[in-house]
Amino acid sequence: MAKSVAPLKSQLFDVLRKAWEDRASDVHLRADEAVVVRVDGILRPLEGLVPTTSEIHAFLDPMLREDQKRRSQECRELDFSCEIEKLCRLRVNVYVQRRQLCVAIRLLPQRIPTMEEIYLPKACVYFCSLNKGLVLVTGPTGSGKSTTLAAMLNRINSERACHILTIEDPIEFVYRNEKAMISQREVGDDTQNFAAALRHAFRQDPDVVLLGEMRDLETMQTAITLAETGHLTFSTLHTGEAAQTVSRIVDSFPPHQQEMVRLQLANSLAGIVSQQLLPLKDEKGRVAAREVLVVNRGVSNVIRENKLEQITTAIQTGSADMMFTMNHSLGYLYQNGFVSYEAALRAAFDRKEFRNKYGEPV
């Protein structure tokens, strides 16, 4: 279980507190270099604060168990999570570059936001109501995938008497049992790896499974099989649009298995939420733009027949089934003054189509 520690009186804990107040997403510590924070997607050095190796070790020490300290020394890298009392949660990666100690820290809220607070589309409510199927949340690193999944799982937690099993590396958000019983397993502490945890998941009587990331062929296959055998399964991929996501999964398998995987996806994939964060036009902060694919009979046939290039068209014509494209979401944000034309155009999956539909900025 991740530690909960009281904030210590040190410059580095003060940096965390200030970074959280400034809505930073990440903090980077490197021995004998200035601390760097990421705010609204942009890295910014903090002048005047240059921690030494011993200061970074002193900062990490109260967060780590003895076995984690040994693992960090033996492997030269470590993933763990931690909670700073009355402040925030941390997802921490300790590593070495050029024999220099480095720490990358992701700042996370202690309270899981509601689906309404992060403006999740109504298709996400539908996904939460399903009893089986594979739901994927995709996007680049730092696009809010973990937060989206946490909000969806907590909705299920508040509404259904079921067993929710999560497999994470490390655990990011901590859930409290409401109507559901929740089992959170952390790779390294509670299980050896994602693949082993997934193989044993079938015997742990889960109704809902969250796999932090589909990292390799084995985890992809097992996640698909879980969804196919009557479990509502959530996971993430670092892909963009929905069509690319389906192609990425299929192409991860050897050629002789790809037809079988397409058939499995056609039967088990429930939907894909693709998202990215854009800077707000006139104020600090970022806003999510999303694309939603809901797998109806038509989309299922497109996947089965390997006509993946038709997925985007299916989304464009699928508004009755709660679908919309990334370009549609970006156009809404631009036309309503949330983001600039330039930011929306940079984020568009189809820039030519976006220019034609929304024109040049006035």
Per-region residue spans from a language model:
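Short, flexible helix-loop junctions that flank or precede catalytic/ligand sites
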Residues: M1-V362
